Amino acid sequence: MAKNLVPSDAKLEITQIKGVIGVKQNQRETLRSLGLKRIGHTVVRSADAVTVGMLNTVPHLVNVEEAK
């Protein structure tokens, strides 16, 4: 889960772990803005302030790890 994230120069691997049925519209839009389309889909994004803010909106729907 995405907790205690702070903006940095690191790359983050973001994986959607839950579906969007029954989820608020702004959370659906946040997932689409992150580039996530389905459960199990993974994207790599930089850990800038915008991305960290989006991840703080949907921490229960995504799994975040530092990219290798």
UniProtKB/Swiss-Prot annotation:
Which Pfam families has this protein been placed in? Answer: Ribosomal_L30 (PF00327)
Gene Ontology annotations of biological process type: translation
Entry keyword annotation includes Ribosomal protein: yes
Under InterPro entries, the record lists: Ribo_uL30_ferredoxin-like_sf, Ribosomal_uL30_bac-type, Ribosomal_uL30_CS, Ribosomal_uL30_ferredoxin-like
Highest taxon above the source species: Bacteria
Decide whether keyword Ribosomal protein is in the record. Answer: yes
An annotated GO cellular component of this protein is: cytosolic large ribosomal subunit
- Keyword entries, A-Z: Ribonucleoprotein, Ribosomal protein
CDD domains, sorted: Ribosomal_L30
Q: Which PANTHER family match?
A: LARGE RIBOSOMAL SUBUNIT PROTEIN UL30M, MITOCHONDRIAL RIBOSOMAL PROTEIN L30
Name of the protein = Large ribosomal subunit protein uL30
